[in-house]
């Protein structure tokens, strides 16, 4: 099984390499940037991609480089980790069938799980793409990130204000954040997957 590690921090890449090198069934490659990873994916064709996208969480606009990277990932299982205390979950949160997100402090637990995976193990991929959010939750989240008030979101979606509030609460519970600011930070990355 091929694993691509992407992190600007040399020590993190070296640590992940050292941890996973004990498994003879894994082939590892590491690169410091998303730009280099986009090129490496074409030749290396990884089964799993472990990537630190913290810097991209700070970029609110559209990032063509990140969009290109995400498109190049194909059917690889992608684990995005962030140098933040959130999401508040000890296990990776699945955003889609192939993409999960976690806080960097839980990276050792992920690596422990990956080191036990044999080369014969196939990564499960569903024939139909799924999402963590319902279509209506996704619409509410998009409007919410533009700072639209509840009553306007409700009017646009033809639902009640309390339903909008309920969707917002479900969104923060699903992504394991406490408030809109934490969600907005993560949203700058996962908006490319929907």
Predicted regions and their residues:
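N-terminal regulatory/sensing modules of transcriptional regulators
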Residues: 1-123
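Helix-turn-helix DNA-binding segment
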Residues: 123-163
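Residues within the DNA-recognition helix of helix-turn-helix
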Residues: 167-170
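Basic, Lys/Arg-enriched C-terminal extension of HTH/homeodomain DNA-binding domains
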Residues: 173-194
């Amino acid at each position: 099984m091929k694993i691509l590690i992407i992190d600007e921090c040399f020590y993190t890449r070296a640590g992940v390499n050292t941890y996973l090198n004990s498994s003879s069934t894994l082939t590892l490659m590491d690169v410091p940037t998303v730009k280099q990873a986009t090129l490496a994916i074409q030749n290396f064709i990884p089964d799993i991609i472990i990537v630190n996208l913290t810097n991209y969480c700070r970029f609110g606009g559209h990032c063509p480089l990140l969009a290109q990277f995400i498109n190049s990932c194909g059917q690889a299982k992608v684990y995005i980790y962030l140098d933040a205390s959130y999401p508040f979950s000890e296990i990776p949160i699945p955003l889609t069938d192939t993409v999960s997100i976690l806080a960097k402090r839980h990276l050792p637990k992920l690596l422990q799980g990956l080191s036990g995976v044999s080369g014969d193990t196939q990564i499960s991929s569903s024939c139909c793409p799924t999402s963590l959010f319902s279509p209506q939750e996704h619409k509410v989240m998009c409007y919410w990130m533009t700072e639209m008030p509840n009553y306007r979101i409700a009017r646009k979606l033809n639902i009640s204000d309390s339903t909008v509030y309920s969707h917002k609460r479900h969104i923060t519970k699903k992504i394991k954040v406490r408030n809109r600011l934490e969600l907005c930070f993560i949203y700058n990355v996962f908006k490319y997957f929907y």
